[in-house]
């Protein structure tokens, strides 16, 4: 299983850590405690809280749940129903990562260009270079690499590429699932067909495993409970 943090920036890792701490606390946490614990400056705290607020808004909308943050400047509290797993928030952080989105683009489209990716995500080439370097460092763990000539694509032998592909599913549970319709099994089948046609070296057993992983993910997101 791959370590989630390999695809994240330092700021994204800090956001994950803050979410975990607030979930575990289950009560108001004084701002001074947060600053001491994470050695955050006033600017860092405010920046992270702004990110957390946007993230919560996105999760509430996409997952049809109700999570809220109570911030009175002196303390902060994260309030969520008991049946809302922390994984919902953590997966949202990972899915919002540019490195993760670039990996998905390359897997589902096979090719992408720096120009197209920058325009789609409103970033400049300097940011794209940081993102592609981070992904390349992660790919090296699987003996794969990015081919950066004209159009970006992932290169590597079949066995290593399959290992990398599987790793994306286990970064944060079944993290590809939210990209599909949560109520449409036909959408799930279409995704499996894309993989089957695009990557012929994926075996029948591979495809069955992927379908099982994603079916469990669909069930989990529909019910709002974590399936382990």
PLM regions with names:
Residues 2-228:
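A cross-family "folded-core" feature that marks the main globular domain of proteins
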């Amino acid at each position: 299983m791959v370590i989630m943090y390999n695809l994240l920036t330092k700021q994204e890792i800090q956001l994950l850590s803050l979410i975990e701490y607030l979930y575990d606390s289950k009560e108001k946490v004084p701002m001074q405690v947060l600053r001491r614990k994470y050695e955050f400056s006033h600017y860092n705290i405010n920046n992270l809280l702004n990110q957390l607020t946007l993230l919560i808004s996105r999760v509430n909308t996409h997952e049809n749940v109700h999570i809220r943050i109570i911030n009175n400047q002196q303390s902060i509290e994260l309030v969520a129903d008991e049946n809302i797993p922390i994984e919902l928030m953590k997966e949202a952080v990972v899915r919002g990562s540019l490195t993760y989105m670039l990996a998905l683009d390359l897997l589902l489209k096979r090719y992408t260009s720096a120009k197209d990716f920058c325009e789609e995500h409103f970033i400049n080439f300097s940011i794209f270079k940081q993102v592609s370097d981070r992904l390349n460092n992660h790919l090296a763990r699987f003996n794969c690499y990015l081919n950066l000539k004209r159009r970006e694509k992932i290169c590597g032998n079949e066995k290593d590429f399959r290992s990398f592909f599987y790793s994306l599913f286990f970064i944060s549970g079944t993290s590809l699932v939210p990209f599909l319709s949560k109520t449409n099994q036909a959408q799930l089948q279409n995704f499996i067909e894309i993989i089957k046609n695009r990557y012929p070296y994926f075996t029948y057993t591979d495809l069955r495993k992927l379908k099982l992983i994603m079916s469990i993910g669909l069930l989990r997101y529909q019910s709002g409970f974590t399936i382990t």
